[in-house]
Swiss-Prot record:
This is Mevalonate kinase. Belongs to the GHMP kinase family. Mevalonate kinase subfamily. Its cofactor is Mg(2+). Signal peptide: none annotated.
Length: 396
C-alpha cells in the first residue's frame, strides 16, 4: 500500500454529434470535456476509511475492522466483470441502505464501497484512507459526472494498492498511465458505472479514461487519433428532461413516419462521419476552413435534432443568442432542455466571447468557457492544482 497522498483527475464528456441516432445503430462522436472531477486519496493509520463528496453533501466513514469482517466473497477475486444486481443488493445491506434507494448520494457511496472492497481485497488488510472527490461538473446534466467519479476512484485505488504504478515522474506536474493500465482503470470504472446506472453503454467511462475523442457505434468504441483541442462554451439551460421519454418519442416518430425519420438518422450519421474526417485533417494542420465546416455541421445537426422532436424553446433561445454574436451552437445529449455547446473559433475576439456569456447568463443559463478533446485520467502534484480545486477538496 502506498503511503503518499494521491491527486487524480478525470474529464467529463459531451456528445459532439450522433445523439439519438446512436440508439438506432448510427455513429456517435463523444469528446472529453475539460471540466474535471478531482480526487484526493490520503492514506492514514486510524483504522477508518472515509468518503467525502462536498458537491452532493456526502460525508461517510466506516471502521476498517468491521468492513474486514464482512463476507465479501460475493465480489469475486479481482474480477472486474462479475457485478450483478444481487451484488448491488448485497452492497446496500453492507452500507445499511434501504433496498429501493436510487438517489445519487446513495449510489455514489455504493460505487465507492464496491470499488474499495473489490480492488483493495488484494491487500493483507483493508487500508485506512480518506477519499475526497470534488467536481467542476454539474451532476445529472448528461456530462458524464458519474463516470469521471468512477474513473477517479478506480485509478486512485488501483494505484494506492500498487496494482498499477504511479506514473508521476519527478519534476512533472502531471502523469498519465500506460495503455495497459488505462485498460484496467476503464474496466473497473465501468463496474462503478454499473453500480450507479445499471446498464451503461461504457462510452462515458471510456472518454473519461482515455480523453480526446471517441467514436461509438453499436457497442464498439474506438479512439480518434490525436483530435484537436476545440474551445467551446458549454451552456446548461437548467431545464430538466427525461432521456428515457425523449428516446421513446424519437422511436415513436420513426415508427409513425419511417420514410421521413430514417433519412434524418442517416443524415445525422453522415454529419458524424464528416466531422470525424475533418477532425482527422485538423490533427495535422487546422485551417480557418476546418472551423467553418465544423460550424456548418453543428447548424445542420441542430436542425435535424429539432426535426426529430428533441429540441426545446430554451435551446432555440440559446442558439438565437449565440447566432446574434456570430457563433454556432447545438444541443448535446438527450435534448429537451439540458445542455448545449457553442464552438469558439480561434479568431473570435475576447469581447465577443464575454458579450455572449453575459447574454446567456441573462437568460438564466449556466455558462462555462472550456474545451473539448481534453486529456483523460491523470495524476497531479499538489502544486499544479488551481486554488479553486484545492479549496473544493478542502471543503466539507
Amino acid at each position: 500500500m502506498l503511503s503518499e497522498v494521491l491527486l487524480v483527475s478525470a474529464p467529463g464528456k459531451v456528445i459532439l454529434h450522433g445523439e439519438h441516432a446512436v440508439v438506432h445503430g448510427k455513429v456517435a462522436l463523444a469528446v472529453a470535456l475539460n471540466l474535471r472531477t478531482f480526487l484526493r486519496l490520503q492514506p492514514h493509520s486510524n483504522g477508518r476509511v472515509g468518503l467525502n463528496l462536498p458537491n452532493i453533501g456526502v460525508r461517510r466513514a466506516w471502521d476498517v475492522a468491521s468492513l474486514q469482517l464482512l463476507d465479501t466473497s460475493f465480489l469475486g477475486h479481482g474480477d472486474s466483470a462479475a457485478l450483478t444486481a444481487k451484488h448491488v443488493e448485497k452492497l446496500k445491506e453492507v452500507a445499511g441502505f434501504p433496498k429501493d434507494c436510487v438517489d445519487p448520494e446513495h449510489l455514489a457511496v455504493l460505487a465507492f464501497l464496491y470499488l474499495y472492497l473489490s480492488i483493495c481485497q488484494s491487500q493483507r488488510a483493508l487500508p485506512s484512507l480518506d477519499i475526497t472527490v470534488w467536481s467542476e461538473l454539474p451532476t445529472g446534466a448528461g456530462l458524464g459526472s458519474s463516470a469521471a467519479y468512477s474513473v477517479c476512484l478506480a485509478a486512485a485505488l488501483l494505484t494506492a494498492c500498487e496494482e498499477i504504478p504511479n506514473p508521476l515522474k519527478d519534476g512533472e506536474a502531471a502523469g498519465r498511465w500506460t495503455e495497459e493500465n488505462l485498460e484496467l482503470i476503464n474496466k473497473w470504472a465501468f463496474q462503478g458505472e454499473r453500480v450507479i446506472h445499471g446498464n451503461p453503454s461504457g462510452v462515458d467511462n471510456a472518454v473519461s479514461t482515455w480523453g480526446g475523442a471517441l467514436r461509438y457505434q453499436q457497442g464498439k468504441i474506438s479512439s480518434l487519433k490525436r483530435p484537436p483541442v476545440l474551445k467551446i462554451l458549454l451552456i446548461n439551460t437548467k431545464v430538466p428532461r427525461s432521456t428515457k421519454v425523449l428516446v421513446a418519442n424519437v422511436r415513436s416518430r420513426l415508427l409513425k413516419f419511417p420514410e421521413i425519420v430514417a433519412p434524418l438518422l442517416t443524415s445525422i450519421d453522415a454529419i458524424s462521419l464528416e466531422c470525424e474526417r475533418v477532425l482527422g485533417e485538423m490533427a495535422a494542420a487546422p485551417t480557418p476552413e476546418h472551423y467553418l465546416t465544423l460550424e456548418e455541421l453543428i447548424d445542420m445537426n441542430q436542425h435535424h435534432l429539432n426535426a426529430l422532436g428533441v429540441g426545446h424553446a430554451s435551446l432555440d433561445q440559446l442558439c438565437q443568442v449565440t447566432t446574434a454574436h456570430g457563433l454556432h451552437s447545438k444541443l448535446t445529449g438527450a435534448g429537451g432542455g439540458g445542455c448545449g455547446i457553442t464552438l469558439l473559433r480561434p479568431d473570435v475576439e475576447r469581447p465577443a466571447v464575454e458579450a455572449t456569456k453575459r447574454a446567456l447568463s441573462g437568460c438564466g443559463f449556466d455558462c462555462w468557457e472550456t474545451s473539448v478533446g481534453a486529456p483523460g485520467v491523470s495524476v497531479h502534484t499538489a502544486a499544479s492544482l488551481d486554488a479553486s480545486v484545492q479549496q473544493g477538496l478542502d471543503s466539507l
